[in-house]
Swiss-Prot record:
Record-given protein name: Large ribosomal subunit protein bL27
GO BP terms, alphabetized: translation
SUPFAM superfamilies: Ribosomal L27 protein-like (SSF110324)
Keywords, in A-Z order: Ribonucleoprotein, Ribosomal protein
């Protein structure tokens, strides 16, 4: 048996923590102002009415209402909040 660990096992053994990206509030859900709707890297989903876009492309509600996803041109999606 080898008495050394070998190059592979000593250089492995680390991983980055999960980033928790994705849709946090789905279509039809009620949200308050400031609620995070989507966490993303880049604008996979674009902001629509009554939502804001953060520095890290997080989409959040700017008013109280119901989440609505809708298609736009060129296979893009847009998320809006429809006020009650």
């Amino acid at each position: 048996m080898a008495h050394k660990k070998g190059a592979g096992s000593t250089k492995n053994g680390r991983d980055s923590k999960p980033k928790m990206l994705g849709v946090k509030r789905f279509a039809g859900e009620k949200v308050n102002s400031g609620t995070i709707i989507v966490r993303q890297r880049g604008t996979h989903i674009h902001p629509g009415e009554n939502v804001g876009l953060g520095r890290d492309y997080t989409i959040f509600a700017t008013c109280e209402g119901v989440v609505k996803f809708e298609p736009t041109t060129n296979d893009r999606r847009k998320v809006s909040v429809v006020a009650d």
